[in-house]
Amino acid sequence: MRVIAVANQKGGVAKTTTAVTLAHDLARRGHSVILVDLDAQGNVSPCFGLPPSPGLYRLLLSLVPLEELLVEVRPSLWLLPSDSSTAKLKMILAAEPYRETVLARALALADADYVILDTGPSRDLLHDNAHHAADEVVCPVAVDHLALIGVAQEMETLKFVRDHGHAVEMAAILPTFWDKTTNESQINLEKLVQKFGDLVLPAVPRTTRLREAPALGRTLWEYLDPNHAAYRAYQRLTERILHGK
Ligand SMILES: Nc1ncnc2c1ncn2[C@@H]1O[C@H](COP(=O)(O)OP(=O)(O)O)[C@@H](O)[C@H]1O
Ligand SMILES: [Mg+2]
């Protein structure tokens, strides 16, 4: 089982979009996948046309076993949902011993090829838990002037977690909201490639199609044309995860 966190402390950089899209592609290709929503906004459920619900809260407080909380949202793809109870969860867990490894321990017995963690935008206890549970991180980054800062912060988090004894690696940096009509996109993409080299994947373009899909409870794979540049960019991400190149 490989656990992959989709993380960047900035909000609105396409973390949830990336987690949903990657998880569904791995499932479409025949792997069993658990998608975990770690954000109190509970944005993952609506992407599948479902209301948010307190799955994460119940799991991490050991109220209900994982198998009973998972919702099958597509063939081979199970969702552990979240909602506003996740905010309360952070306060309750703050008093626990070994509090940054609660998620890792809860997922240790999970039966899946991949676990994909969609994280929230703040550096908090659940963010620490995601990094302590993850083997690898995918960092989506909007190619604006804050792009480099977002990735640098994520790299610092990875170093911190490694220094505390948990092996976790950056698997891919995914530039998002690429806009061919602005110099800003190009300049910031070039800066990312200069600094992080092959870790940086081809950029996902800004497209209203990607905004429309979740509103209809559909994923990118069910809504975009396979020739669309965003479709191809997300295919490259899956291939990086599967084959490491
Ligand atoms: N490439 C894109 N082009 C246009 N809109 C996008 C793109 N990727 C994501 N979005 C939209 O941008 C918003 C923020 O994306 P989201 O994945 O929720 O980010 P995060 O989880 O980092 O806050 C959502 O409405 C989403 O549908
Ligand atoms: Mg999100």
Model-derived segments and their meaning:
Residues 1-245:
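P-loop NTP-binding core
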